[in-house]
Every structure is written in structure tokens, then in C-alpha cells.
């Protein structure tokens, strides 16, 4: 295979991608990476139109094509409309990346029904119905990528039962969905990041560290880097590149799998 042929299999020219929760952080990096590979991108947001438009503007400035569409994926009716509107605008949809999510910490004894429902509504139920609508709207040979977490795989994390449970369910989803989606040759996979340095990173990361509330942001970075033998923390681009691979022809034989993106971290 020539270098040109190898490059072409990583490209997404002519494809249309939808990324939920892509106004910032990991989602923004995924949307940008898919656009850099040639895809037109639907940048979804729930509550931050300015942030989403910033992502769209950056993609367009770099020669790409993108639009911002609002939808709260905890509301199935909004999810349905999101996919309908995406197809109405671009005429097709080939890639769906479910990135929307919320974090939650709390000892088992303190978890309320409201908190349980809030987290599952987005992280689990929301992702399920994003995948359902993706199956209905995607072209033959499309890609569905769901968002898991190292906490769905790693040893137990204190005060993290609800969040970890929402992510553990996603791993089972993709194994079963991959079979259901086979009739349209759609692959379904899960990316499971470890700690990724986004705007929420330091506040969340302190919850994983004993006495973390007493550490400065610099000390948090130093501590978190030791979780990986590569001695650094994860960046949004680390997740985005894997999503780009899965979305491309290069990833067409990866199906029903959970890909850990954690630098071999052991928390």
C-alpha cells in the first residue's frame, strides 16, 4: 500500500458526522478531528450556544464545514429532532459520536433518587436513544461511537457508584448493538477514557485523589501523571484521534469493542 492509499483510508471526505456534547472539552476535540479528516460536522450542544458556535467557527476557519444544533439528549424527543434536523440539513448522516455526559460523586448512603435519575438520564438512557436514532438515520456502513470511562472497567472508585454504573452499562450496550446494527453494516464501539485534561479536569480529578481537596492544580497534575507509565495526563486529542480512527475506513473491522484510552493508567 502506498503512502497516499494509507492516507486516504484515514480520511472522511464526503461523510457527515454528528457529535453530541461537542461545544467544549472532549466533544469539541472530536468534532474538530473529524472535520480535519474531511467530514462535515454537526456540533450538538445542550446549554452553551456560544461555545458550540466557537467550535463551528474554528472548523470553518480551517476550511471545514459544520453547523451547531441544540438538543438535550436526556429528552428523547429532542434527540429525535436532532437527528432529523441533521439529515434535513446535510442530506445524509454517516457517523454518530455520543459524547454528552455528566459526572457524579457521592457515598452510596447519600445518593438521592433525583441524582440517580439525573445521571442515568444522560449517561446511559441518553446514549441508548442516541444510538437508536443513529441506527435509524445512518447510511449503510456507518459508525456509532459511544462514550464509556475507565471507571466502568477499573477497580472500584470510592463515592462513584452511580457514575461508574452508567458507564459500565455502555460496554454491554455496544456488544449487543453491534449485532443489531449488522444488517446495515454499522459498527458500534465504545471509547473509555481515563482522566482527560478538560476545563472540568482539576475539580473532578481531586475526587479521585486521597485528600485531593488540599492539592493545588499543579500538584493534581503531578499526581495524576503517575497513574500512567507514560507519566503524563490524557488530553482531549488523545480521545479524538481514536474516534477518528474508528470513524474511518481504517477502523471498519473494529466492532462491538471497548477501547480504553488511558495510557495504561491504574488508579
Curated annotation (Swiss-Prot):
Its EC number is 1.1.1.-. Induction: Expression is positively regulated by the cluster-specific transcription factor TSF1. Expression is induced by the presence of the cluster-specific polyketide synthase PKS1. Expression is up-regulated during nitrogen starvation. Belongs to the short-chain dehydrogenases/reductases (SDR) family. It comes from Elsinoe fawcettii (Citrus scab fungus). PANTHER family: NADPH-DEPENDENT ALDEHYDE REDUCTASE-LIKE PROTEIN, CHLOROPLASTIC-RELATED, RE15974P. Keywords: NADP, Oxidoreductase. InterPro entries: NAD(P)-bd_dom_sf, Sc_DH/Rdtase_CS, SDR_fam. Reductase; part of the gene cluster that mediates the biosynthesis of elsinochromes, pigments consisting of at least four interconvertible tautomers (A, B, C and D) that have a core phenolic quinone to which various side chains are attached and which play an important role in fungal pathogenesis. The non-reducing polyketide synthase PKS1 was proposed to iteratively catalyze decarboxylation between acetyl-CoA and malonyl-CoA subunits for polyketide chain elongation. The active site is at 149 (proton donor), 163 (proton acceptor), 167 (lowers pka of active site tyr). NADP(+) binds at residues 26, 72, 99, 132, 163, 167, 196, 198. This is Elsinochrome reductase 1. CDD domains: THN_reductase-like_SDR_c (cd05362). The lineage of its organism: Eukaryota, Fungi, Dikarya, Ascomycota, Pezizomycotina. The gene is RDT1. One of its GO terms (molecular function) is oxidoreductase activity, acting on CH-OH group of donors.
